[in-house]
């Protein structure tokens, strides 16, 4: 028995089709270009703060990069379970990279909140 998450609870409204249902998991996984499109449409979550016009592109690019890395990490999960050593190493490196980007995004959010 495999775990199938409730995608409707975690997918943005733009990913829902016209009937209000979610596409199958194989077709509903957003690509990095779709994430970037969503990001350019809505921007990163602001946590209730408005961003200044000075460095507003920096957090968006970091956030978009983080989303792209997370998507790439998802591709390494199945080969890792199948025993692929190279996929396991890519997964480890990707997690380390993503953790660094999360720290950078949080620091940027805190800087924007203070200004």
UniProtKB/Swiss-Prot annotation:
Keyword hit for Transcription: yes
GO biological process: DNA-templated DNA replication; positive regulation of protein phosphorylation; regulation of transcription by RNA polymerase II
One Pfam family this sequence matches: CDK2AP
Sites bearing Phosphoserine, chain numbering: 46
GO annotations of cellular component type: chromatin; cytoplasm; cytosol; nucleoplasm; nucleus; NuRD complex; perinuclear region of cytoplasm
Subcellular location per the Swiss-Prot or TrEMBL entry: Nucleus; Chromosome
Signal peptide (from-to): none
Post-translational modifications reported in the UniProt record: Phosphorylated in vitro by IKBKE at Ser-46.
Coiled coil listed as a keyword: no
Keyword list, A-Z: Cell cycle, Chromosome, Disulfide bond, Nucleus, Phosphoprotein, Transcription, Transcription regulation, Tumor suppressor
GO molecular function: DNA polymerase binding
Subunit details: Homodimer. Component of the nucleosome remodeling and deacetylase (NuRD) repressor complex, composed of core proteins MTA1, MTA2, MTA3, RBBP4, RBBP7, HDAC1, HDAC2, MBD2, MBD3, and peripherally associated proteins CDK2AP1, CDK2AP2, GATAD2A, GATAD2B, CHD3, CHD4 and CHD5. The exact stoichiometry of the NuRD complex is unknown, and some subunits such as MBD2 and MBD3, GATAD2A and GATAD2B, and CHD3, CHD4 and CHD5 define mutually exclusive NuRD complexes. Interacts with monomeric unphosphorylated CDK2. Interacts with CDK2AP2. Interacts with GATAD2A. Interacts with HDAC1. Interacts with HDAC2.
Function description: Inhibitor of cyclin-dependent kinase CDK2. Also acts as a component of the histone deacetylase NuRD complex which participates in the remodeling of chromatin.
UniProt family annotation: Belongs to the CDK2AP family.
Name of the protein described by the UniProt record: Cyclin-dependent kinase 2-associated protein 1
Top-level taxonomy: Eukaryota, Metazoa, Chordata, Craniata, Vertebrata
């Amino acid at each position: 028995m495999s775990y199938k998450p409730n995608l409707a609870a975690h997918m943005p409204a733009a990913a829902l089709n016209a009937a209000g249902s979610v596409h199958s998991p194989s077709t509903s996984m957003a690509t990095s270009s779709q994430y970037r499109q969503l990001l350019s449409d809505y921007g990163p979550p602001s946590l209730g703060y408005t961003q200044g016009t000075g460095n507003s592109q920096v957090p968006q690019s970091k956030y978009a990069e983080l989303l792209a890395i997370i998507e790439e990490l998802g591709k390494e999960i199945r080969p890792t379970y199948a025993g692929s050593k190279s996929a396991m190493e890519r997964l480890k490196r990707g997690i380390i990279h993503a953790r660094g980007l999360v720290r950078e995004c949080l620091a940027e959010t805190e800087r924007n909140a203070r200004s």
